């Protein structure tokens, strides 16, 4: 089956690139032909400011404001682009139309993973695109591990009305967080399955193959942070002192260095003695590589994506509160891996069943 994937931009985003890589790898293993459609959109700053001002006036709220999209095509770290070109089959699309289905001979579309259903991350027509508003009724439509980014409802009434109609056209919907199951039911009137982020459908060995050529590093505390701040570094310093190990830091987004690579990022988890992170995918890869970790929550919210997975795996004690480290104890990885294997089987089953069914069954 030829499957078109819609997800967030590759950008300077380790997690965004890797979740798409993982989903394609899984679909390939299941015998399908995946193709990711990358948005080629560039908003002027003026247009973004006007859209933001309009939303503030309309909602009289500062919640859920659109994030300025600092991208245009494949602008970004050259090493990241090299990884994408080598490992992810993708095409750049400016306008999403029904003609895409015929042009690429697609049998199905899948939306996900990552925060594909968060309005602030999908300006203008992109939110409708993420609900496949351009796809006709003949093609199969699924979401896999779609995320709203938080448990609060951020849609305007107009967005909710439009997207709920589109969501009802899907053959099957799956989401990444438990709260998203409720949001789908309460606001879209649709049932959704809870599944794992696609990165968790691959195992440690799959990622080790990618970083095989990276030399082994000395033992260290690995800090991977969306924004390296005092809270993250305070925790890392305490653990560094307790374990007498150096700290290695990598940042996401605009702080990615030109020499950084996806392969080296995998190797940091492979070789780390301990991980401190405020990132969802930082937490995920600590689990995949069975590394003890501490997660520093974002005080501004959006933490449900962490809590949903940690609670499923019995790892809630890894959350840092008020910079107090509650547990440096080793994790019972045998128990965690057993739980993960059950969840992995259920998530794989969602893809197997729904892509094997005929559209409309």
List PLM regions with ranges:
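Active-site anion-handling motifs in enzyme catalytic cores
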Residues: 1-361
